[in-house]
Amino acid sequence: MPASPIRKLVPLAEAARARGTKIYHLNIGQPDLPSPQTGLDALKKIDRTGLEYSPSDGYRSLREKLVGYYEQFQIKLSPDDIIVTTGGSEAVLFAFMSCLNPGDEIIVPEPAYANYMAFAISAGAVIRPVVSSIEQGFALPDVAEFEKLINDRTRGILICNPNNPTGYLYTRKEMNRIRDLVKKYDLFLFSDEVYREFIYTGSPYISACHLEGIEQNVVLIDSVSKRYSECGIRIGALITKNRTLRNAVMKFCQARLSPPLIGQIVAEASIDAPRSYSTEVYEEYIERRKCLIDGLNRLPGVYSPIPMGAFYTVARLPVEDSDDFCAWCLSDFDYEGETVMLAPASGFYSDPACGRNEVRIAYVLKKEDLERALVVLGKALEAYNNRK
């Protein structure tokens, strides 16, 4: 089981904090913005004498509320197409466990969310990467690169759209090419779409559920964590119109009994948040994105493409080993009592050499803190490269 590139440096961060160093956390996608007041109010108003199990697929009232939410994005579902999970992570794990046998393979564009590898290992499956490049803005590689990897053990393709860690947004043309491949070889399409509300270019959001002819192949992964700043309530969803697959997933759901009761109450109420909440959050991330990307590309030797969605970027640094640099920032560096914590990009590739001089940066800090973090990062790079 690989260590998380997002969390593996935590012991060094704790030691730095114990020394009195202030850390700017650019390493993890933990939104710092308030959760919807509707959700917080629902939490405060819980008046129960017991906290019982919920149904294994989640409360129907929440699933009905989610149907209405997805309708805003032209995704037509019924409550029975939705299974509430303990975060989006459990949705990915249950999807893999239900669709893949040991030794089966899934094709994944990389860099990719690091925990996909851990979930594949848990299912006994093998990830076959198709590597995108920072020079091309992490655009989807040519479909021919996918087709080269397909064999009799290939069971699916996994995408994240908008992408974590790169912020790339798939075009309609790219999604149609994936659809054609899924249809041709009768593969599952696992589509992680938790960042759909964070698209900054005016480009359309193309869901896997919008693709005609593969309705039985699509497994949509979702979560309330990012759009409502509710990572801690651990509520996600696995969505499929494939009844055979749903029945298989439900066996895993029944084995873990139920998704979190209190989390479901908060999530259901959060869906009722006024549109102004989403608008304010969206506008804040637009400002942060501009601040971060402009600032990164002004630093000597640093390059970041402009992310189209989510709230991450993968940047190339003027270092040979970003793992070493990120650890050094916490163990051996501070500038005026401050340092930065980054996620080495090597952990987002199957072959760590692919991201050796790259880092993932999350812009989940207020603009003033991002500006200061960029100053500290610049000083860190200068000091690191001037070591004797």
For each feature predicted by the language model, list its residue ranges.
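PLP-dependent class I/II
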Residues: P2, L9, A16-Y24, I28-K45, ...
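Generic structural signal for well-ordered alpha-helical scaffold segments
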Residues: E14, V67, E71, F96-M97
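P-loop/Walker A NTP-binding region and its immediately flanking N-terminal helices
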Residues: R48
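Conserved N-terminal alpha-helix of the aminotransferase class I/II PLP-enzyme fold
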Residues: Y53-T86
